[in-house]
Structure formats: structure tokens, C-alpha cells
Amino acid sequence: MERKVSVIEDLNGKKTVFVHDILFKGKRAVNWDEVEKYLRQYVGEFYQIEDCNKMIYIGSDLPDEYTHSNYTRILKGANAKAKANAAQGLPELLKIATNEVYEDNRKEKHSKDAKYGWYSYDSRFALPVFGDDGEIKRYNVFNVAMLVRHDEDGKYYLYDIMKIKKRNEQSFPVK
């Protein structure tokens, strides 16, 4: 599936992943089964975080965790749609991720899949806001935490994206 995604660096050197299309629409709720199906295309792929040179793999657990995690279940409205559509830019979100933070594993259920702990990274993405004429009026920017597990096989796997927060002070107008 063709992805309409680009990475743009601002004057301060901060990178943002621009997703130029809204694949997952809906007045009421996100169809998470469609998002899960979309995410399966990434399974088996891997991407390097430029900031720390870690290779992050996409495991077969990501589509289900991303779409059915406790965090996803509590998302409503714009943040739910933001998470659903951020799926289009996962490779780029990983590549531009910064601010690595390590945390020990604390749950027995993750004793194998996160045997060596968890890493969190900051990333940013922007989604288009369309006018009544169907043209893009502006982009809303969101901060997000990329959650990565360090598996017993020694590899790092993207587990979920969390802490999605719209940046109110910044939207990119389109001329």
C-alpha cells in the first residue's frame, strides 16, 4: 500500500513526520480491526533510530497490541484518530525518535518479551485538517511516546505508541 508520508525538519532542527492522508476516518469511532490489518504489512521489517542507532524490529505482536492495548481502549475522539492514522508513519516515527529513556520490566507477563526492559522515545507527527472543499487547510502536530521492548532474543521491538498529545500552540498552515 502506498504511503503518503514525509519528514520535515523545522528551523530549530526538530523533525516531524507529516502524514498527508487520513486513511482511518469515521464520525464516531475508529475501526481498529482495519488499523490492525494495515499494521500487519510492517511485521518482519526493522528501522534504525537515527539518534541512537538502535535497530527496532516490528514483531507479530505489534498489530494486536497497538490496536487493542489498555491505552488504545481509553482513547477517544481526535487522539484515537491520531493514533490510528499515525500507523501510516511508523517507520519514520521510529527513525526520528529521540530522548531514549530506559525502564526495568515490572510485569511477570512480560518476563520473556521484555526480559531486558523497556525503552521509550519521543517522536512527533502531523495530520492534515481538511476544509469543506476537500483541500488541506492545515496540519495538527502531535507528540507521541514510542514504547519499545527489549526481548530475550536481544532484539528491540516496537510495542505500542502512547502519550499522544496534540500541540495546541502549533499547527502548520497550508498556503
Residue ranges and their predicted role:
Residues 1-175:
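Ribonuclease/tRNase effector modules and their secretory precursors
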